[in-house]
Amino acid sequence: MAQNFGKIPSHKSYVLSLYRTVLRNIPKCCHSYAFQYEIKKTLSKQLFKHKHDKSSWSVYTLLNEFSLLNNCLLEGKLQEIKNLMKPLKKMKKQLETTKILNSLTSLGDVKTNDPEEVRRFHVLSAYIKRKQDLGLLPAYIPKTYQHKLLLPLALNEHACLKLFHIQQKLKNGPPSAGLSYTKEGRNQIWFVRSPINKGRQQSKKLGILIRKERKDSQKNIDNLNFCEINAAWALHEAIWEEYLESKKIIKVNLPKYLEYAANIPKSTKCNPSSQYQKIKEWVDPVREIMFELHSKSFQRVEYFNKYKEKLLKNGGQLAYFDKKSKEMYAKRLTLFRKMSKETLPYVTLFIEGRDLPSVLAKYGF
């Protein structure tokens, strides 16, 4: 069975040696940085492309050209090097041109539309389908009628539904800001949720904090799991050494011994509670590390509980966003009343600029 030349040690050694020699000779014999880069790039591509060649004639031809390139460099024949590289460039350009032509052919007559036009088209399509399902429109409708007659009706119906939702929201009264949280490990990260700071308006720092806490919590859990595994091995070592010295087998409830209580004093947490010296030597160092990890976790819990109190304080973020939400509601209510009084009675479906979608856009709805 034919074998790749790259797997033959003598061939691999020869190619790498020649490649290193050429790379050393390029800056010595060629003073143009652009041409140096071009030669190196072409060499790298060709070596990667023909890495798995099995044809002996192809490999032989390429090695001859490689050796000729090195000789041309040493003799300063840069024009001959360009001639050697021309077929490779030509092939690349042809391939790129073919790809472009194929992509253009596949595109056909498809045109890129404006996003607003696409939105209007979807509204019209949904309107026609709905009316056809109810038997209010025929199966075939000419394009002229669709755009000149049905499109204004479809947009008006869509805008009426939007207007109804706006009216209902304003009728429900001013929205209030509230506290929400996301849980990461033991931590509850509290933050203010309101109409002002939802979606893209949400604080980027909050997102960074949540991702950081998620990463740190997972790291803490992984470290505790690793310590539990090491504690089990340490207990086996302690039992074995105690048996060798006193011929006694230690009986220890390891999960209970490693159990951490958040409400006991620090001195009690970290002091060894075992009467066996070998347990103190082997298991207690791991136990102390686990207690430190637990302590760090509970400190973060306390920190976020205090942060919640800070958010709830008078003049804090909750009060600020609540005030801003009410101001936004009052502004929208004023605009809605103004629009209802001055513009809505004079809406005309088929006059652009005086139709309902244009009126809603004008007043920021």
From Swiss-Prot:
N-glycosylated. Glycosylation is important for correct localization of the protein. It is found in: Mitochondrion. Keywords: Glycoprotein, Mitochondrion. GO terms for cellular component: mitochondrion. Belongs to the RRG1 family. Essential for respiratory growth and required for mitochondrial protein synthesis. Required for vacuolar acidification. This is Required for respiratory growth protein 1, mitochondrial. It comes from Saccharomyces cerevisiae (strain YJM789) (Baker's yeast).
